[in-house]
Amino acid sequence: MTSTSRAFVTILGLTAIFATAPATAHAVGTPENPWYFESMRTEEIWEHARGEGITVAVLDTGVDSSLPELQGQVLDGVDFTMDGSGAHVDTDGHGTHMATLIAGTGKDGGIRGLAPGAKILPIRIFTGERGFFTAESAETWKEGIQYAVESGADIISLSSGKLDVIGNRGPLKEAVDTAIRAGVLFFASAGNEAEGQNEPHPPASLDGVVGIGAVTPEGERSSYSTYGPQVALAAPGNDVPWHCEGLDGPLCLHERGGTSSATALASASAALIWSQHPDWTKNQVLRVMLNTAERSDDQRRDDYTGYGIVRPDRVIVDGEGDPGDPDSPPIFRDYEARLSPPATPSPSPEPESDPAAGAESGADAEAASPAESSGNGSLPWLVGGGVVLLLVAVTGWTVWRRRA
């Protein structure tokens, strides 16, 4: 397919707390059919599962439900900010974009999400105007996470990779504990600081939270994607669909969508799997995600992409992945056993196919051999067991902008 030259304008920047990097013009796929749709065999997935029956709580800047692709997709939600304008108000755009990547329907030419059958529970916990949080605002995060649990969310998607809670992380940790005990699957951005300090930050660095890194269409860790033991999985973070001139603007491809976008797509992947297997627990959904993740080498895990790149198609289309014991977490076993009351029974030995055993802190754990492809729908950078680069025609102007 011939790529069309496009001139992109600078899009609205986000504050430092968001795991979204500056946007640039870069032609990979199209906004209507991004590259990962083909890689993940999305059309085939949708013949089996679309995310129906799954609620994804998006803790962010709110979700503008007036977008055509989000009409009928967004639940009432709640606004915990001092602004108090409502959960369906998003003056920044970050939360809305995360929601579209998860559950957008594509209506009227809008963004198509990976799990269009899922529902979004918007929980507005910041407006995008602040780069750090005080001990008082940590209580707001706690309230937001607890609201997600009490509202019956199956998945929490938190696209903030650098949460600096000044003075007290206790409330945030307590809220995570509550979510894990309730059987909620919690994803959070690893962050976009690899080119700087590359320090782990909550929430991804907290026990129980599945840290998500970002990858390029070439299957490589995105240059900005924070790495470390907190990274459990990776998902597409570059060249993702975006409204590039504000939420009412035309679609484009956000070249550096960040680990924010990767977290949204990992959450959507989990929603697809869970909708096909509604009787599974969070442990089983996460286990098959880890076991079927795509790797280009024979390592069991590394600090850059964790156990690999999410491949929901391998589970849904090919039937790969053993869900295992519903009560035994594939990672964070010791942490969950220490919870009072415990989230799961005491850890017990798992089969060798289990991806991780006895993870004490973060996602770094002893893992089994990486999942091998069945030969169907391999990602474009994996051919004949080797790593190859996509042939990409890149045209247009590159534009950078950072909000101070």
Predicted regions and their residues:
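Protease zymogen maturation seam
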Residues: T2-I54, P68-E69
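Subtilisin-like serine protease catalytic core
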Residues: W46-V56, V63-D76, G86-A135, E220, ...
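Loop/turn elements at helix/coil->beta-strand transitions in domains of secreted/extracellular proteins
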Residues: E52-T55, G117-K119, E150-I156, R181-F186, ...
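Hydrolase catalytic cores
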Residues: A99-I102, I125, N238-V310
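Substrate-binding/access-modulating region of protease and related hydrolase catalytic domains
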Residues: G128-P202, L251-R256, S261
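C-terminal subdomain of the subtilisin-like protease fold in secreted/lumenal serine endopeptidases
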Residues: S157, H277-W381
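Active-site-adjacent substrate-recognition loops and nearby beta-strands
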Residues: S189-G208, G213-Q230, W242-G257, D298-T305
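C-terminal membrane-anchoring or membrane-association module
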Residues: P380-A404
